[in-house]
């Protein structure tokens, strides 16, 4: 009898060989992808709304990508420049919208505050009427008279007095910055500077990923909206996170959140930090704490109009700790204030610390590129240690 076991045709044998080779290639690629995945540091940016998370992401793009271009992967410098200019042009509208929102919000608040604020020059009332009349106009085209009225109102001492009470209503942080630049922004050939783009406020909704490389190490940074209704999306990002960067608006001690106009913003951040620190899915993930908006905190403390103890009574008994390291020339009142806020967060992390994750605080100013460069460089060793521990290599 003939042997039937070797009845495969030449074509079948070639096909099986090709399949084996294809499987090997797939397996090799999967192993390579796995190595790249395991070598990537995934950073999750969390924090309450308007704490500065998106500004941190913008700084990473300035420092480690090609600035403000679309993808950040162009090898051709001319293409990168072209994309960067294109994105800046699209941001002009966002900046103009910030400017419009700022002057609208201030003049609308004047009559609603208790006690109300009067115009220093009553003849400017027609300008107020104009600003309020265009408040909800869709696709506003920013005619010259808008800039004229906005500038005249911004120079009115009554409007300035209302601005000084902005903790009593909801005003974007960049209001003064852009109102001071009306003459620049109104120009037809206006191109935003990097600082303009850093200051520009656009509500983050959803999850945004930014990829960048530092000294051949891959980083993926996830920016998630901080408003209450956005937080349910956070859990989608918890898988394989190397570290959490929790961003706090330190200057918000005298402000309330937009969502309910009642809850103190800094208290909201403390509550949120506590819930993240104690979350059972995150008990092994350390937190890098960015105590942000130090420039605005210093302004408020030195102005002396809103005292921290009026909102956090325990500050009256607080003394600056021995480990405090003031910035050169820093006023002792500012040092005391910023370390008080730091210690409020550290009380939470030490109260329920189990040695499985740690909190690393840093004082930041997200609109200051050099500050963020220095802080992120300081954090890289911490992130590397977390990454090694994550894959049980340490």
Curated annotation (Swiss-Prot):
Compositionally skewed regions (Basic and acidic residues) per UniProt: 8-23
EC number, UniProt record: 3.6.5.-
Lipid-modified sites (N-palmitoyl glycine): 2
Record lipid sites (S-palmitoyl cysteine): 3
G3 motif: annotated segments: 219-228
InterPro entries registered for this protein in UniProt: Gprotein_alpha_S (IPR000367), Gprotein_alpha_su (IPR001019), GproteinA_insert (IPR011025), P-loop_NTPase (IPR027417)
Residue(s) carrying Phosphoserine: 352
Region span, G5 motif: 364-369
Cell inner membrane listed as a keyword: no
CDD domains found in the cross-reference section: G-alpha
Catalytic activity: GTP + H2O = GDP + phosphate + H(+)
Region (G1 motif): 42-55
Annotated positions binding GTP: 47-55, 197-204, 223-227, 292-295, 366
Chain residue numbers at which the record places covalent cross-link Glycyl lysine isopeptide (Lys-Gly) (interchain with G-Cter in ubiquitin): 300
Keywords, ordered alphabetically: Cell membrane, GTP-binding, Hydrolase, Isopeptide bond, Lipoprotein, Magnesium, Membrane, Metal-binding, Nucleotide-binding, Palmitate, Phosphoprotein, Transducer, Ubl conjugation
Family annotation (Gene3D superfamilies): GI Alpha 1, domain 2-like, P-loop containing nucleotide triphosphate hydrolases
Family: Belongs to the G-alpha family. G(s) subfamily.
Cited PANTHER family: GTP-BINDING PROTEIN ALPHA SUBUNIT (PTHR10218), GUANINE NUCLEOTIDE-BINDING PROTEIN G(S) SUBUNIT ALPHA (PTHR10218:SF357)
Other information: The GNAS locus is imprinted in a complex manner, giving rise to distinct paternally, maternally and biallelically expressed proteins.
Assembly description: Heterotrimeric G proteins are composed of 3 units; alpha, beta and gamma. The alpha chain contains the guanine nucleotide binding site. Component of the TAS2R14-GNAS2 complex, consisting of TAS2R14, GNAS2, GNB1 and GNG2; within the complex interacts with TAS2R14; this complex plays a role in the perception of bitterness. Interacts with CRY1; the interaction may block GPCR-mediated regulation of cAMP concentrations. Interacts with ADCY6 and stimulates its adenylyl cyclase activity. Interacts with ADCY2 and ADCY5. Stimulates the ADCY5 adenylyl cyclase activity.
Record protein name field: Guanine nucleotide-binding protein G(s) subunit alpha isoforms short
Organism listed in the record: Bos taurus (Bovine)
């Amino acid at each position: 009898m003939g042997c039937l076991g070797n009845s495969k045709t030449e074509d079948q044998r070639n096909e099986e060989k090709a399949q084996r080779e294809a499987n090997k290639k797939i397996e090799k690629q999967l192993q390579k992808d796995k190595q790249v995945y395991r070598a990537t540091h995934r950073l999750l940016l969390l924090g309450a709304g308007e704490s500065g998370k998106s500004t941190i992401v913008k700084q990473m793009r300035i420092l480690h990508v090609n600035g403000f271009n679309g993808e950040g992967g162009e090898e051709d410098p001319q293409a990168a420049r072209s994309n960067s200019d294109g994105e800046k042009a699209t941001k002009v509208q966002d900046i103009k919208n910030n400017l419009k929102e700022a002057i609208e919000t201030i003049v609308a608040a004047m009559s609603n505050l208790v006690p109300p604020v009067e115009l220093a020059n009553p003849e400017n009332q027609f300008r107020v009427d104009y600003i309020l009349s265009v408040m909800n106009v869709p696709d506003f085209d920013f005619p010259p008279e808008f800039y004229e009225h906005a500038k005249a109102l911004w120079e009115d001492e009554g409007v300035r007095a209302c601005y000084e009470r902005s903790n009593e209503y909801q005003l974007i942080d960049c209001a003064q910055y852009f109102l001071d630049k009306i003459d620049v922004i109104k120009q037809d050939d206006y191109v935003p500077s990097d600082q303009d783009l850093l200051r520009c406020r656009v509500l983050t909704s959803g999850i945004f990923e930014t990829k960048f490389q530092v000294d051949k190490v891959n980083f993926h940074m996830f920016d998630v909206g901080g408003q209450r209704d956005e937080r349910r999306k956070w859990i989608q990002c918890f898988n394989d996170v190397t570290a959490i960067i929790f961003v706090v608006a330190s200057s918000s001690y005298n402000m309330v959140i937009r969502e309910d106009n009642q809850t103190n913003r800094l208290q909201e951040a403390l509550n949120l930090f506590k819930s993240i620190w104690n979350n059972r899915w995150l008990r092994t993930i350390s937190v890098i704490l960015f105590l942000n908006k130090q420039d605005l905190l210093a302004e408020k403390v030195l102005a002396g109009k809103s005292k921290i103890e009026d909102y956090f009574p325990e500050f009256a008994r607080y003394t600056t700790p021995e480990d405090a390291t003031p910035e050169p020339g820093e006023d002792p009142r500012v040092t005391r204030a910023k370390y008080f806020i730091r210690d409020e967060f550290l009380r939470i992390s030490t109260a329920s610390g189990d040695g499985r994750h740690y909190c690393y605080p840093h004082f930041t100013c997200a609109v200051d590129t050099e500050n963020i460069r220095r802080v992120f460089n300081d954090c890289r060793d911490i992130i590397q240690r977390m990454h090694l521990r994550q894959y049980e290599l340490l």
